[in-house]
Amino acid sequence: MLTDKLSYFKKRVVRKYYPFFVLSLFIFYPTSSFAEDIISSHIQEIRTIAENGAVSLALQSIDEQQHELDVKNNLTTWLEWERERLSIYQLGQRWQVLQQRVADYEEGLPEIFYLWAKQQQVDALLTLKKGLQARQILQNLIWSEKEVDEKWLPLWQKRIIKSYLVDNEIADALLAAQRYYQDYRSTGIDDRLLRARILLINKREEEVVELLMQDTKHPEGGMLYLLAQLRSGERPPRKVYQSALRQMRGEWADEKLKYMLWAVAAESAKRSGDRPSTANALEFVLAGHKNIELPEGLFSFSSDTLWDMYIEYALYIGNKAQFLIGNDQQWLNAAVKVQKKAPVKARSLYAMVMLKGQNEDTRLRAAKGFLNLMHKRKRGAQLVMKLFLKSDYFKTIDLIPTPIRYDIVKIALSRSNVELASNLMTTIKSAPDGVDSYQWQLRRARIFVLGGKPKKGSEALTRLLEENKTLTQKKLESFLQVVFDLQTSKEHELSFQLFSAVLPKIEEVKLQRELYYWMADSKKAQQDYVSAARLYLRSALHTGNNGLDPWGKTARYQVAEMLAKADLLQDAHAMYQQLLKITKEPARRAVLKHELQKLWLLRESEEKE
């Protein structure tokens, strides 16, 4: 086993002293301590850019700095930038990019930097829940023939434990933890808490009660001790539930502790048969926290745990009130009656009808009621996403009630998750009640385009044109904006077809003229230079224009360029000459003369051939 090798390896380690060594499990290597104590103002500036949200811009700046360096002669500077790069990857949570970057390192980097970077790679893999891959890297480090400072070993061994937890290999995690404590005899609180979590996951609650008996005043220690009391049966579930709520109100309770205590409250309430308290606590757990996760493997809650509790609670209410299964209106009326004073109770009743209702109308009404109430609670949007996108009750998107799908699209777009919004939109064909159908269908098409489904977007736009024989100026402009999105995404044939289809619906001459130009742009991008030249010229001369106004001159210049690319050099020469005659600005005349000179060289080259 890997941990056996660790004990052997300790005996042959060479002791070295590195003053900047980091001991705690997930503390990042300090960027100021490797080469210089004072980081350059340039690095500080780039870090500030990243900290203000422009992570990609910061990384691009680092790319430029490192690209200009001769690594062989400027290794120290290159390493400073590289450490900052990895730090910014961490800041932007770009874990996959980070781990791949380190994996691609070439040999020859200083050992102390290399080992630190590998540690960052392992941490990234653990964050990505790739425990096996992390263990393989640790194994290579441990079995390496190179001698390293023994202070690395406890760091690696702790990560081995973490890797087993990530992979839900709880028995191996316990063995690795036992070996760690046997090797290092650590008495620190952090190590005791880690050991307690692993013992709890392995159903050895009695040992946790004994282990943490002196740590009950420590915030997390008290929480784990409470959980051990619950699972060992040492304390009644109701008492544990009450204690969890009391601890949440303590001045020492930070957001992380409160979140974990809600999980303890949910488990204890469920064990005591307290349905409303269980449902309430589960909502807090599943709504999650922006930057906090429950300890790996310690609790086993899922979306279906809450759905099941909603139904169980609703059935309990219905049985007491003698509601009839199948009389959906009874259940809906009860939900409406209590939704202000008892929202969890109302959500349970709505969930019952939504999942078990006898007809589509009442199921949809229940879904709307459930959704409305859900958005009145903190992190309601997150809970909606979790309940409907990660549940066996809704194995495919089309099983999610339509009002909920509309809502998740809005949530997804608010979080810039266009791919999710696009996937949901493929299952929705009509606009929600009370929403302008044209604008909604247009929005649907745009989501498809931006979400990487250009063909579906084009089909949606084509249907819009078929369903609307005439379009107002405002509708035309919004329609064309989506076609521009399609053109920007380099779908030039689709955008050309749509420009052609909408052209007959346009009455304004100015807009017609502009449309020919945009159509020409698509043909130019497709390298159909003859068609592009024809369309640019049509734009220049549309409805009797002589093409001598600013728009016409611009279009004529494009005509000349397309003719040259189409190898129609004589026509291109004539077009440039016409433009030169009517152009007065010196700078533009210089450009035209340059183009004529290029044409002359091309024609001379052809004549020689």
Region roles according to the model:
Residues 5, 11-19, 584:
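N-terminal amphipathic/hydrophobic targeting modules at extreme N-termini
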Residues 6, 34-609:
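Acidic, polar-rich low-complexity tracts and alpha-helical solenoid repeat scaffolds
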Residues 11, 24-25:
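Extended rod-forming repeat segments used as scaffolds/tethers
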Residues 28-30:
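N-terminal signal peptide c-region/cleavage motif recognized by signal peptidases
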